[in-house]
């Protein structure tokens, strides 16, 4: 199963978030998953890469020409360079069976919203799990509730993804859906 992990590349973030990346990616690599990610060697993204390397899993990184220099640190994966972030998002989506969204910044939000919209508009059944430990995504989820209340989106938007609050919930959700995905 190819799992697309969305997360941060910023080193300045709290180590707490990096520990989430290590825990989740270690669990996935131990459960015979392969990694699809926006090829970056730093912070949460780099930690995910390292955990999958340790388990000799297949790794597929996608990046744009602006970040191609970082690929020299990602020697254990197949690297794909796409001209735009639009192409990058599409190829990561198409090459994954499951999407796991960890805490992240504007790139992570952009990817998450793109994949929710792709699922909503094109009836994709690809699972999306938002890992909301420490209530990181509370304001995002509140914004979606406001959009529903103001009738900008239907309430079924919340059916496009699953929210988990900790590693235990994540593992349970993963095992429940594992048989339903490649």
Segments (PLM) and residue ranges:
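Glycine-rich, charge-decorated loop segments at or immediately adjacent to ligand/cofactor-binding or catalytic sites
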Residues: 43-47, 136-148
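Short, acidic/small-residue loops that bind anionic groups at enzyme active sites
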Residues: 63, 119-141, 155-156
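Acidic/glycine-enriched connector segments
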Residues: 44-103, 107-108
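Glycine-rich beta-alpha loop segments
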Residues: 1-59
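A charged, well-structured terminal subsegment
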Residues: 98, 150-182
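Glycine/threonine-rich flexible loop motifs
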Residues: 14, 109-112
């Amino acid at each position: 199963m190819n799992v697309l992990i969305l997360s941060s590349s910023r080193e300045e973030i709290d180590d707490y978030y990096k520990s989430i990346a290590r825990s989740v990616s270690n669990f996935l690599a131990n459960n015979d998953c392969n990694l699809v990610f926006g090829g970056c060697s730093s912070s949460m993204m780099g930690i995910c890469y390292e955990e999958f390397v340790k388990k000799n899993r297949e790794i597929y990184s996608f990046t744009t020409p602006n970040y191609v220099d970082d690929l020299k640190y990602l020697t254990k994966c197949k690297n794909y360079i796409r001209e735009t972030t639009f192409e990058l998002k599409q190829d990561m989506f198409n090459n994954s069976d499951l999407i796991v969204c960890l805490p992240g910044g504007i790139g992570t939000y952009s990817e998450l919203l793109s994949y929710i919209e792709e699922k909503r508009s094109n009836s994709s059944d690809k699972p999306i799990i938002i890992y909301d430990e420490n209530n990181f995504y509370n304001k995002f989820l509140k914004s979606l509730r406001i959009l529903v209340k103001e009738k900008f989106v239907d309430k079924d938007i919340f059916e496009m993804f699953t929210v988990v609050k900790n590693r235990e919930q994540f593992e349970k959700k993963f095992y429940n859906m594992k048989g339903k995905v490649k």
